[in-house]
């Protein structure tokens, strides 16, 4: 209560003083008493604030660090009074010439520095710094010391320090001499008085060290030696505690650090809470530790009054001036200048090191504030290599370790150790100290990491990050259980608590926690990198002991070992490849025991959502790098296959597989164009899927890092782990992620490397037969996409990465195809098979055709007599021009340059395989420019038919013979090439042999044969056994055709039905479907009658198909007569747009779904009264079961619900979060027999409610449908076999299309539907060329039939059971406009659009455009929405008129189905050929299809409903 009163008094007194100042200001009164009293108030509250033991490096405004503290309130009161602050600086400091007033003002300014924006004061107020320099040199006490302290605040700004270099050089020397004098006076006074210090009790330290409370940390970091250059220091130091404040800048301690690295503040209560969390975590993990707070309570015999001078300090008043205060303020000035290289000689010359050794000894100073300031100055000097080396050599480290803890000075030690760690030479000397000294250093730093202020913890963590490269430090860290201590830093973070994520924390505390996470992950990465190198040495030494060789001697423990990222990757690859199957690695075992893999995965998942945190990317990357190193151990890999609790987008806890988090990051889902993160994530995947499936035998002898430890080995365990990882990566859509990364183009500087890594992961994954089968059917291989990617790098400067990508891509092709390839060959799997057939084909041609060509050539060159002789001798026909027309194109096409390269591929394969005998019989010879192959010699001779070229005496060339092997010539040519380039040294004997057998020119028959083989290679379906080729007519292998193949011409097929029912031969039905479903004729348009804009959203035919059911955007259901076009009924079903309609087959029930209103879906009765039977509140999509229609399946997000139609009860819920694919437009559906369900890309058994199989995900939206044949599943572009779960085909044209089958299941409609939101809509419009069109496909072989462009965006489409009509919901509005005017257009299937229809439609579109232009000119002032409405309305009315006129005859001819069939038959007899074909085909389909409807009284039902 007293404290509260005092606080209130302070606040009130300051307010009173300000009021008094306002009265007396300008009246000539003496202001010194007012300013002095203000200073006393501020100093008193500063001491109270410091009693809370705040972080001494926390440079935030005190009111921000502790909103309850009175110091913050007082500072705010002062800063709000602009008049007073301006007078304080301008009048009392800058312009006044009265020393007492100057002194009082400087004292107050010094007191309020913790809340002051120093840059504003010292940079914007000209002349103030000059005044301070003058006073610091010449003024009397205490003004001289106050101005020196204020200059310390000014010099924190680097720009100011740079502007006053000369003044600083002079003043530094002056104050150092003063410091030396004051220190000597202090020593002399102490010796004179002989008074013992309060601390001089015994040789024991004042505050005994609690060894058990010391926690340990580790990390490894490439050491950057800091020479003291300001900018280098600021670049390397990744630690700061500055948070932006309205009044205050960073303190000098942080001027060498990154300013955005934010402020860390921990008040007393927060510290106690953190320690409590820490203790709980340790108890939970099963480790014992004493409470660090025991230090005071149990281990000290002294009272707090005696201890406080060494813990928080007591002397916060600046008057009267004492030597301690003067020394403290001088050190405050020197601290920001300590890091400047140009001032180092002055510091060295004037004995700064000896001074600092004195000041950091609390036994000498008896003032923790003075010692703390000295430690800050010492830290800045330690940036210099020379000073740091001398400091270590003269026992400086031991002096630091004598500083008692906990205390403010101990936190200062943390910064000294951190800065010292940056100096590699100095750290080497530290590591060469006696073992107990280095042990104390590690121990002390571990205590700082666990029990110090937040800044001390951060400095200690960073110290270990750098020093893990020294093996001596690493070993001591492990000895003191450092890994657990380090991990506890993040395991106790509130922001990783999934329940509240630190909801009660302030922004500063959240930022501080994130900083802790970042620094800890960085230290963990360095720790495991250092251990990885040690483990690699152990494995190599074991291998060398086993297989012989010289042992590798490790580097001395006091030497730093730093490694590049490439070296780390190589180490991981070596351990995975050559390490034992049951690799035992102590750090990984400890990490596993502490459940830290799940912890890191949670951190990655949560950190992905730290959108405002500047180091979010670094934090995630460090954590990923740790996991990458750890995944060299199979046990850790298996941890990634386990479930982890993470937060979803809504903030609720969900369970997901660890590898899915990694895959999400690799895909770039959270970090757009951050290549480093993607590469780290890919490295984890590579480590998991690229391990050896069979280990080298000698490795089995090496079990562990320590010779003593032997583990039982299961030879199958590594294969089991590998197979499990393949499966878990595949089941979490790893194939999709990796394939998407193969075509990545951004960021351009790293795209090639990301491609290479993704391809490497695919190579490892493709060893799984399941994955291999799926990949082989994807466009990547089936359409040569991977060869296109191999042609050019994304960035020419990254060719080395592209070469790696090509290497892995070639390996991937070899794995998938089963055949070796030459890198860079443009080949798909189909081409490989084709090339194999071509290579085996025997090429022959008529002899006389060649002679005719020769004769024609001779005539064209004017050699008529020779031609005549040839004609007589060869008995050729006399007419020279008979084949000239055929000859010309053959000659023109004979250039080998323009021919396909496929035969060369086959030849390349054969050459690589080296099967000379086989090649001799089958491999083709490429046309080459080098001389003709010589006869085979020596080892190159091949068995087989004799080579005609061997005997030049034979006059007649045999054309029908086995083709010579190209390998003879190729082999010799390879030898010659190597010789020419100096890569192969021939012996003189071989050279002479080659000279004797110079290659002869290619023979004419070899040129002709090669030309014909190239022609044969162009055949779509080449056959191995061919008839003789003609030189005058292009060769074409016949298409594969069955004996009873139906003719393509419809009339011929119709005539053949008598012989070959039922479709006129094999594939007749397919030809019929191609004819019918490529023709659609618009016949009528349905729109809402009384509305300005029509708003249909979905459509369905009624059971007997006399009516068209249309859902509107207002939730109404409207029924239109198909034949008259009149609206027959209207019902209010929902309060939002209807998205789906499905009537039952008997017409008695109807399912509807809406966008957002409750209920989302409903089941309606349509017998005597239209009423709601059941509602499905949360299911956004519902449909009937296929076979019996006794159940309804509803979809809610990723969950499927099955309901009973009679009772409405929920029968089953089908959902497994571990298998979820999270398709955006998931729609659960039954298979044709109702015993299987496809939901979210997962196949379920309805009877057992168990998931059967998860189909791989290759798109984000479409969840898939069953083919009506019940044997296949179609998910977007992929066709899956239900019996084997193999991927059968990919149909790129189906991308992002909704699939609708006709009643017989023989034809498939695909339409890209409108997206739910505008972003998706624009994305899909850009992605797909079919936004305003629908396509038809043959549902038996998935070949496209036709693309019908309706020139408007499609919302929905449906077809009737007889394949007569197709209804399409089209948006009449502009593509770019936000307004929507949707109508339902009815198309007649199998009818061609008439020419007059097309002309009228073009005229109508032109008129619409003209009207829009006129309206824009006339109605500039009209409201935008009204303008759009009017235009669309006028255009639509006119279009309706045109359509009605155009389709009048058709409308009159409408009648029930029997009459329609009769009309079609009549038209088929009299019509022209094309129309006859179409009409007959329509009759054919309708004749074979029968309706299964049970409702013969549909008209009566509709009438009764209306009544």
Curated annotation (Swiss-Prot):
Changing residue 378 to F: Does not affect serine/threonine-protein kinase kinase activity. The keyword Phosphoprotein applies. The modification Phosphothreonine is found at residue 888. Its EC number is 2.7.11.1. Residues 141-500 are annotated as: Protein kinase-like. The modification N6-acetyllysine is found at residue 701. Residues 562-593 form the Chromo domain. Residues 1418-1507 are annotated as: Interaction with NF2. Induction: Up-regulated in a number of cancer cell lines (at protein level). It catalyses: L-seryl-[protein] + ATP = O-phospho-L-seryl-[protein] + ADP + H(+); L-threonyl-[protein] + ATP = O-phospho-L-threonyl-[protein] + ADP + H(+). Pathway: Protein modification; protein ubiquitination. It is found in: Cytoplasm; Nucleus; Cytoplasm, Cytoskeleton, Microtubule organizing center, Centrosome. The keyword Kinase applies. Keywords: Acetylation, ATP-binding, Chromatin regulator, Cytoplasm, Cytoskeleton, Host-virus interaction, Kinase, Nucleotide-binding, Nucleus, Phosphoprotein, Repeat, Serine/threonine-protein kinase, Transcription, Transcription regulation, Transferase, Ubl conjugation pathway, WD repeat. Gene3D superfamilies: Leucine-rich Repeat Variant, YVTN repeat-like/Quinoprotein amine dehydrogenase. The modification Phosphoserine is found at residues 202, 255, 828, 895, 898, 979, 1000, 1328. PROSITE patterns: LISH. A motif (DWD box 1) lies at residues 1242-1249. Residues 1091-1290 are annotated as: WD repeat-like region. Acts both as a substrate recognition component of E3 ubiquitin-protein ligase complexes and as an atypical serine/threonine-protein kinase, playing key roles in various processes such as cell cycle, telomerase regulation and histone modification. Probable substrate-specific adapter of a DCX (DDB1-CUL4-X-box) E3 ubiquitin-protein ligase complex, named CUL4A-RBX1-DDB1-DCAF1/VPRBP complex, which mediates ubiquitination and proteasome-dependent degradation of proteins such as NF2. The protein kinase-like region mediates the threonine-protein kinase activity. Component of the DCX (DDB1-CUL4-X-box) E3 ubiquitin-protein ligase complex, named CUL4A-RBX1-DDB1-DCAF1/VPRBP complex. Interacts with DDB1; the interaction is direct. Also forms a ternary complex with DDA1 and DDB1. Interacts with NF2 (via FERM domain). Component of the EDVP complex, a E3 ligase complex containing DYRK2, EDD/UBR5, DDB1 and DCAF1. Interacts with DYRK2; the interaction is direct. Interacts with RAG1; the interaction is direct. Interacts with LLGL1 and LLGL2. Interacts with histone H3. (Microbial infection) Interacts with HIV-1 virus Vpr protein; the interaction is direct. This is DDB1- and CUL4-associated factor 1.
